[in-house]
Amino acid sequence: MGLETEKADVQLFMADDAYSHHSGVDYADPEKYVDSSHDRDPHQLNSHLKLGFEDLIAEPETTHSFDKVWICSHALFEISKYVMYKFLTVFLAIPLAFIAGILFATLSCLHIWILMPFVKTCLMVLPSVQTIWKSVTDVVIGPLCTSVGRSFSSVSMQLSHD
């Protein structure tokens, strides 16, 4: 549609000691650096954000606008999306990454140093608590329930039709 979406990627590779020996440029083996642009979303966490202009704005066959309007609106959409994303990331990415790092570090610390020792302690103590609870049940609650059961077992009811 007249809009360039491919990035022009130019890279120059120099060996560390090449500059000190002569003033010319040493070109490194380009096959070593084939995968220089790595995927920033390898686990596809944000695959739902891969929307294009056609995914958001669609004109049915019966209601087409002028071609120039469609091309200009598509170009404006892509440019504004690109510029606003870059603008927002410049001002928000670093502070939000800092806050997320602090939050993650805090939660990790609490989990490692408080929650897991507490859970392990409870799991170690539970067999002893279970034994004590069984003894209390056998000594106190068992006889109490037995005596209440015997008391109510002597009660009898008779129904008469008057």
Curated annotation (Swiss-Prot):
The gene is Cav2. Pfam families: Caveolin. The modification Phosphotyrosine is found at residues 19, 27. Residues 87-107 dip into the membrane without crossing it. PANTHER family: CAVEOLIN (PTHR10844), CAVEOLIN-2 (PTHR10844:SF3). The keyword Acetylation does not apply. It comes from the Eukaryota. This is Caveolin-2. It is a peripheral membrane protein. Belongs to the caveolin family. May act as a scaffolding protein within caveolar membranes. Interacts directly with G-protein alpha subunits and can functionally regulate their activity. Acts as an accessory protein in conjunction with CAV1 in targeting to lipid rafts and driving caveolae formation. The Ser-36 phosphorylated form has a role in modulating mitosis in endothelial cells. Positive regulator of cellular mitogenesis of the MAPK signaling pathway. Required for the insulin-stimulated nuclear translocation and activation of MAPK1 and STAT3, and the subsequent regulation of cell cycle progression. GO terms for molecular function: D1 dopamine receptor binding; molecular adaptor activity; protein heterodimerization activity; protein homodimerization activity; protein kinase binding; protein-macromolecule adaptor activity; scaffold protein binding. Monomer or homodimer. Interacts with CAV1; the interaction forms a stable heterooligomeric complex that is required for targeting to lipid rafts and for caveolae formation. Tyrosine phosphorylated forms do not form heterooligomers with the Tyr-19-phosphorylated form existing as a monomer or dimer, and the Tyr-27-form as a monomer only. Interacts (tyrosine phosphorylated form) with the SH2 domain-containing proteins, RASA1, NCK1 and SRC. Interacts (tyrosine phosphorylated form) with INSR, the interaction (Tyr-27-phosphorylated form) is increased on insulin stimulation. InterPro entries: Caveolin, Caveolin_CS. It is found in: Nucleus; Cytoplasm; Golgi apparatus membrane; Cell membrane. Phosphorylated on serine and tyrosine residues. CAV1 promotes phosphorylation on Ser-23 which then targets the complex to the plasma membrane, lipid rafts and caveolae. Phosphorylation on Ser-36 appears to modulate mitosis in endothelial cells. Phosphorylation on both Tyr-19 and Tyr-27 is required for insulin-induced 'Ser-727' phosphorylation of STAT3 and its activation. Phosphorylation on Tyr-19 is required for insulin-induced phosphorylation of MAPK1 and DNA binding of STAT3. Tyrosine phosphorylation is induced by both EGF and insulin. The modification Phosphoserine is found at residues 20, 23, 36. PROSITE patterns: CAVEOLIN.
